[in-house]
Amino acid sequence: MRHALTLFPLLLVPVLVYNLIAIFGGGGSDAAVSPALSSLDSSLIRMPMISGVRWEFSVGDGILFLGFVMLFIEVIKATSTRSTAIINHAASMFVLMFCVFEFLLFKSFATSEFFMLTMLCFLDVFAGAMVTIVSARRDVVVGDGFTG
C-alpha cells in the first residue's frame, strides 16, 4: 500500500475534486463568468471573529487548503531516491500539463482557485525535482575527499 502511495501524485486529489465540482456543480447563466464559480464561492464555514467581522471559508478555499496539504506531503516524499520517486515526478508532470490544458481551454477552469491549484502542481514538479537532486547528490561521493 505504501509503495502505491509513493507512485501516486497526491495533488491529483484536489484537481479531481475541482473537476467533479466543475462538471457536476451548478453554474450561473452569465456566459462571461465561469460556471464553477457559484459552487466554489458557496460557504463551508461562517464564523464571527472577535473583531466583529464574519470570516467565511468557501469550497474553493477548502480545495486550496487540501492542495497545500498534499504539496507538503509530496515534498516530503521527494526526498526518496528510489525509482518510484522518479515515476512520481513524471506523473506529477502529467498532472501539471493536464491542469494547464484545462485552465487554457475550458471556461469552468478559468478561475483563480484552479490557477492556484495549477501553480501548486508547478511547485510540486519544480520542488520535487530539486529535492530529489539534492538528496541524490548527498548520496554520491565525489572523488576529492579520498586522497591518501
Over which residues does each language-model region extend?
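Structural signature of hydrophobic alpha-helical transmembrane segments
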Residues: 55-67, 88-91, 115
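Terminal transmembrane helical module of multi-pass membrane proteins
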Residues: 128-148
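Cytoplasmic-side transmembrane-helix entry/capping segments in multi-pass membrane proteins
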Residues: 5-10, 34, 83-93
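Alpha-helical transmembrane segments and their membrane-interface exit regions
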Residues: 119-128
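C-terminal ends of transmembrane helices
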Residues: 71-83
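Membrane-helix boundary elements
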Residues: 12-56
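Hydrophobic, membrane-inserted alpha-helices
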Residues: 70-71, 94-102
